[in-house]
Swiss-Prot record:
Lipid-substituted positions (S-diacylglycerol cysteine): C20
A molecular function GO annotation: pullulanase activity
InterPro entries hit by this protein: Carb-bd-like_fold, CBM41_pullulanase, Glyco_hydro_13_cat_dom, Glyco_hydro_13_N, Glyco_hydro_b, Glycoside_hydrolase_SF, Ig-like_fold, Ig_E-set
Keywords, sorted A to Z: Cell membrane, Glycosidase, Hydrolase, Lipoprotein, Membrane, Palmitate, Signal
UniProt source species: Klebsiella pneumoniae
Top EC class for this record: hydrolase
Protein name as annotated: Pullulanase
Pfam families in the cross-refs: CBM_48, PUD, Pullul_strch_C, Pullulanase_Ins, Pullulanase_N2
Length: 1090
């Protein structure tokens, strides 16, 4: 074990580099801290270094863009399309004229010279910072968002380079960097190998290194830092397998005497030059590969965070590139009570320090001294622990905590078990998942104690409308609650005095958000009204031309308590804003109390939505950047050329393909599984994870709970060049589930990215496609039949090998049914498919029906459309999934993406009075292009009221009761589905809108699964007129007892079964017809030969 201080590391680096020198075996009497005199010195081309074009004066900032192409071109460059996107936020608000719309490209250069354009930016103050994105049109020239902090650049005059996220103090610095070190296209992939296309066939290729500053040309244009000579080699098979997207790069070998351990603690730059030393190219080096190669094996064996054991506390953090790490301990009032240097383990790259048991409950942070390639500086800052299990308010400090402390457990916690088994495929197939958000559950429920609304403990309010409603759903067959993100999130302020929710006085909003005082709503600051009351006033005159509700709600969103939570800050701590006290351990016990209430009182298992595909932020300056401050450029997925953090997910993409982040994910899941008794995990954007990493994590967690279930969004992420992604098709046969977009789109109509008239044109099976067209509908009969095929396939669990008769009368496997160029069927078992027609993403089902339904469809018809759509999920094979409030006709007033639309647009009313329809135009930034369509359709039908909400709730319970009434609805096994499930009314002459699924339990199917039945029929009539089935002549079918009991309130009300077996289905109806079993198993409803 070696402990380095920063000074020791600097000294060590000089010894290292004088030893490894330039790779030459000859001795040298020259200065050991400079390259050998006999080697060619690399230098810049002979181009004059620029001064500033302009400098900022009072209340101004200046940004120069240094343009290398323009400098070296013989003709004048055109900068007319270059522009800045500028915005204020809570932490950076110095702009006097932010840009309101991303499509506004009017902030063009104030001027230019031969070195590039510049912008003079007006400020409202000379302190703080500004947010900047440099663009060409609306295309980013620099992938990362830039923050210019005036504390760092006191003259407020800076320079940037396209493709480089660094901000430079002067044009001279940026010029040298641009002509010197640009991009980050070299990859150090293992201890011996560097990959770099820029070095191919170049006479001189070197790896330069600096431990204390950036590698750059000096005042004479020369590169005088230490370096290693690199020699050409070939890409090994192992490297090619680990980094397939880099396998075509030129490969170089490092000298055998290179000290990797110390080289990684400073800046490394790959440089290629001509024989005479004139620089050809220079680039920063990405080091994630070598970090894994050098440290991961030893590091994976260790535990991290603050661990209580053996009468003390061990603090451990993995920070192999850090020059120094200290544990800084704080008292409850956040005063420093000690700073302790940590010891570095050279094998693992981990730093640790052992403290006493008196530190239990103490707050702490890590003080880092580490080189960060984004700033190209050795940074010093404090950062919270990524392995923290408890936090202070607003996640500013980590806290030492023992999760096994009995004081943090509700009574009976240790004996808590899951109410629904998850051991077998048949168990999993019974899952009916109710996706919920903590605030949506109780923020509006007046029967929940005021102090618990929007909190974990609202689920313990047993007499509340919300809890009673969930109990009713549970009794009818809903088995699981899925909680949208409940880990520590970055986008809700936990300091209550900084927050204003719409239930509070408008004056409070004005206090916490100064922008309101200068807005069109300033007059309400002294009104005495609540924000909600003002919104209710505004909605009366809200329109596409005057969308006041969304304008005010946008201001509310800046300081309210609402966010979906897909903004991970600390992965393994419950979110504090949902606790009655966000400080310290209260959140832990209250979270556990909620889990206990859901399992014991509601009788449901708990699934947790996890978001490991991105972090909220990255870089050395953002408050919510954690991992990237500790091991810079390791935990984030970087662009292979620029080194910028990718943002394909939404935010700062993470890199689960790197071993130590894969470990962090598995360690985090283990805590949620063992310490919080979570029964399943839903992975956000799972396609951004490697399949191997997801499978490895599952195996790790199954060792703790063999019955755990994994599923997620298996959309194609376009990361297949890097690794085999965890996508729908790739996960076939693994047992891991993925959401199916096939049934979703066929039933809802269109796709999730439709906008404008396309939202109305593209009807689905559930909204009248082919049977009740609206005025814009343009689907052909063939297209309607194809939608029906996709719906049938979805009801059969989207199995790749399921054989069905398609729209043309041909027998096809599921994998041969087209879905936008991809296989319609992709799964091996129905438990690998999660079917849905509504979840938190995109518009609610009610809003989509409102977009698409014909004006002829009255309110009663639309309620039944909702039920018919949900029936395809609830009565089909596969796992059933639904969004909270679908049973209440939930509307978000046409909002496509309500992640930050607050309590106003996300309201769920458990008093069953209001479904939140037509409460104002949705956010203009997302839905502005839909305003004209919304205006046309929103008044086509009356707003649902109590009668409609009660009716839909009854329909919903009918469907869930039917689902749990027979194991034939939940077969679980792919071979069983193919042996038992079939469809009638198929082919080219089918009756449009009519779906008829049979499930056999007769002798040909094998052993009887339901002793009551020889088979059943699911008949869905998604049409405005009755349909007649003649396929069951001679069969003694009878309506399900559940639907018979429901009588005139049933979705099957009016179904007629003639003596000869002919079945007549009324419009917009759902019927489950049972074939009773006699004294012995009968012939059943066998699958037809195809």
């Amino acid at each position: 074990m070696l402990r380095y201080t920063r000074n020791a590391l600097v000294l060590g680096s000089l010894v290292l580099l004088s030893g490894c020198d330039n790779g030459s075996s000859s001795s040298s009497s020259g200065n050991p801290d400079t390259p050998d005199n006999q080697d060619v010195v690399v230098r810049l081309p002979d181009v004059a270094v620029p001064g500033e074009a302009v400098t900022a004066v009072e209340n101004q900032a200046v940004i120069h863009l240094v343009d290398i192409a323009g400098i070296t071109s013989s003709s004048a460059a055109d900068y007319s399309s270059k522009n800045l996107y500028l915005w204020n936020n809570e932490t950076c608000d110095a702009l006097s004229a932010p840009v309101a719309d991303w499509n506004d490209v009017s902030t063009t250069p104030s001027g230019s010279d031969k070195y590039g354009p510049y912008w003079v930016i007006p400020l409202n103050k000379e302190s703080g910072c500004i947010n900047v994105i440099v663009r060409d049109g609306t295309d980013k020239l620099i992938d990362s968002d830039l923050r210019v902090a005036f504390g760092d650049f006191t003259d407020r005059t800076v320079s940037v380079i396209a493709g480089n996220s660094a901000v430079y103090d002067s044009r001279a610095d940026a010029f040298r960097a641009a002509f010197g070190v640009a991009l980050a296209e070299a990859h150090w992939v293992d201890k011996n190998t560097l990959l770099w296309p820029g070095g191919q066939d170049k006479p001189i290729v070197r790896l330069y290194y600096s431990h204390s500053s950036k590698v750059a040309a000096d005042g004479e244009g020369k590169f005088t830092d230490r370096y290693l000579k690199l020699t050409p080699t070939t890409v090994s098979q192992q490297v090619s397998m680990r980094f397939p997207h880099l396998s075509s790069y030129a490969a170089f070998k490092l000298p055998d005497n290179a000290n990797v351990d110390e080289l990684l603690q400073g800046e490394t730059v790959a440089i290629a030059a001509a024989e005479d030393g004139i620089l050809i190219s220079a680039t920063q080096v990405q080091t994630a590969g070598v970090l894994d190669d050098a440290y991961a094996e030893a590091a994976e064996a260790l535990s991290y965070g603050a661990q209580l054991a053996d009468g003390g506390v061990t603090f451990r953090v993995w920070a192999p590139t850090a020059q120094q790490v200290d544990v800084v301990v704080y008292s409850a009032d956040k005063k420093v009570i000690g700073s302790h240097p940590m010891t570095r383990d050279s094998a693992s790259g981990a730093w640790s320090w052992q403290g006493g048991s008196d530190l239990k409950g103490a707050f702490y942070r890590y003080a880092m001294t580490v080189y960060h390639p984004q700033s190209r500086k050795v940074e010093q800052y404090e950062v919270t622990d990524p392995y923290a299990h408890s936090l202070s308010t607003n996640s500013e400090y980590s806290q030492v905590v023992d999760l096994n402390d009995s004081a943090l457990k509700p009574d009976g916690w240790d004996n808590l078990t899951m109410p629904h088994a998850q051991k077998t495929k048949a168990d999993l197939a019974k899952m009916t998942i109710h996706e919920s958000h903590i605030r949506d559950l109780s923020a509006w429920d007046q029967t929940v104690p005021a102090e618990l609304r929007g909190k974990y403990l609202a689920l313990t309010a047993g007499d509340s409308n919300m809890v009673q409603h969930l109990k009713t759903l549970s009794a009818s067959g809903v088995t699981h609650v899925e909680l949208l993100p409940v880990f520590d999130l970055a986008t809700v302020n936990e300091f209550s005095d900084k927050v204003a929710d719409i239930q509070q006085p408008f004056s409070r909003l004005c206090e916490v958000n100064s922008a309101v005082k200068s807005s069109e709503f300033a007059g309400y600051c002294d009104s005495g009204s609540t924000v909600e009351e003002v919104l209710n006033q505004l909605k009366q005159s809200d329109s596409q031309d005057n969308p006041q509700v969304q304008a005010l709600n946008t201001l509310v969103a800046q300081t309210d308590s609402y966010n979906w939570g897909y903004d991970p800050f600390h992965y393994t701590v419950p979110e504090g804003s949902y606790a009655t006290d966000p400080e310290g351990t209260t959140r832990i016990k209250e979270f556990r109390t909620m889990i206990q209430a859901i399992k014991q009182d509601l009788g449901m298992n708990v699934i947790m939505d996890v978001v490991y595909n991105h972090t909220n932020a990255a870089g050395p300056t953002d408050r919510t950047s954690v991992l990237d401050k500790i091991v810079p450029w390791y935990y984030q997925r970087l662009n292979e050329t620029t080194g910028s953090v990718e943002s394909a997910t939404c935010c700062s993409d993470s890199a689960p393909e790197h071993r130590m982040f894969a470990k962090l994910i598995a360690d985090s899941l283990a805590v949620w599984t063992t310490d919080y008794k979570i029964d399943g995990f839903r992975f956000d954007l799972m396609g951004y994870h490697p399949k191997a990493q997801i499978l490895s994590a599952w195996e790790r967690i199954k060792a703790l709970n063999p019955d755990i279930y994994f599923f997620g969004e298996g959309w194609d992420s376009n990361q297949s060049d890097r690794f085999e992604i965890a996508s729908q098709i790739n996960l076939k046969g693994t047992g891991i589930g993925t959401f199916s977009d096939r049934l979703r789109d066929s039933v809802r109509g269109g796709g999730p990215f439709d906008s404008g008239d396309a939202l109305r044109q593209n009807q689905g099976i559930g909204s009248g496609a082919g049977v009740l067209p609206n005025e814009l509908a343009s689907l052909s009969d063939d297209q309607v039949r194809h939608l029906a095929d996709l719906t049938r396939l979805g009801m059969a669990g989207n199995l790749a090998d399921f054989v069905m008769i398609d729209k043309d009368g041909a027998a096809k496997k599921g994998s041969e049914i087209d879905y936008n160029g991809a296989p319609g069927g992709y799964a091996a078992d129905p438990t690998e498919v999660v079917n849905y027609v509504s979840k938190h993403d995109n518009q609610t089902l009610w809003d989509m029906i409102s977009y698409k339904a014909s004006q002829e469809a009255d309110l009663a018809t639309r309620v039944r459309m909702q039920a018919v759509s949900l029936a395809t999920v609830m009565l089909g094979q596969g796992i059933a999934f639904d969004q909270q409030g679908s049973e209440l006709l939930r509307s978000k007033s046409f909002t496509r993406d309500s992640y930050d639309s607050g309590d106003w647009f996300n309201r769920v009313d458990y008093s069953l009075q209001d479904n939140n329809y037509n409460v104002g135009m949705p956010r203009i930034s997302d839905d502005g292009s839909n305003y004209e369509v919304i205006t046309r359709v929103k008044e086509m039908v009356a707003t649902p009221g109590e009668a409609e909400l009660k009716q839909m709730t009854a329909f919903y319970q009918e469907l869930t009761e039917l689902r749990k009434s027979s194991p034939l609805f939940t077969l679980g096994d792919g071979s069983a589905v193919m042996k038992r499930v079939d469809f009638r009314n198929t082919g080219s002459d089918q009756q449009a809108g009519l779906l008829v699924m049979t499930v056999d339990d007769g002798m040909k199917a094998g052993a009887s699964l339901d002793s009551r039945l020889d088979g059943l029929v699911v008949a869905i009539n998604a049409a405005p007129e009755s349909r007649t089935l003649n396929e069951f002549a001679g069969e003694t079918l009878q309506l399900s007892a559940i639907q018979q009991t429901a009588g005139e309130n049933s979705l099957a009300n009016g179904v007629q079964i003639a003596a000869d077996g002919t079945v007549t289905l009324p419009a917009w109806s759902v019927a489950v017809l049972e074939l009773p079993q006699g004294e012995a198993q009968g012939a059943g409803l066998p699958v037809s030969s195809k």
